Amino acid sequence: MANIDAAFGLRPYERSGSNYNNQGVNAYPLNFDGSSAGSTSLIWTGSPVIPLASGLIDIVGNANGGTVPLLGVFMGCRYIATDGTPTWSAYWPGYAAIKSSTEATAFVADNPHALYVINADGALPDAALFANANLATAITGTNTSGYSLGELG
């Protein structure tokens, strides 16, 4: 069966070495104390994220040539919606979607030894296996599923 050409961002599938693979994530703030604006960018599950000088995180954008090292891969978030509903979401809808004076938390797969699966936007030569690669896009996704549409370029 042939592979399906459908972008889905980065999916962690194992860790290098011989350690337990629990697909663990760590929590990072998307805003502080509900008072700072926080990220207005949409971030989808499978999107690469970077740390900001403010202590928050944000989506990386087109990552090749960036000056900020990758923090990890966004795996979802929790926040209080504007109607007061506690919400777990596969994507971050931006600060405007959360209730004022509340905090939002992102969950990021940030193990530096994690290995990921990602779709390519075309055929790759065998020499590309286990090599570094550029992202064709990292800043798109679908709000319906909450998943990134990032893929290799």
Regions found by a protein language model. Give the residues of each.
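Surface-exposed, low-hydrophobicity beta-strand/loop segments enriched in small/polar/acidic residues
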Residues: 1-153
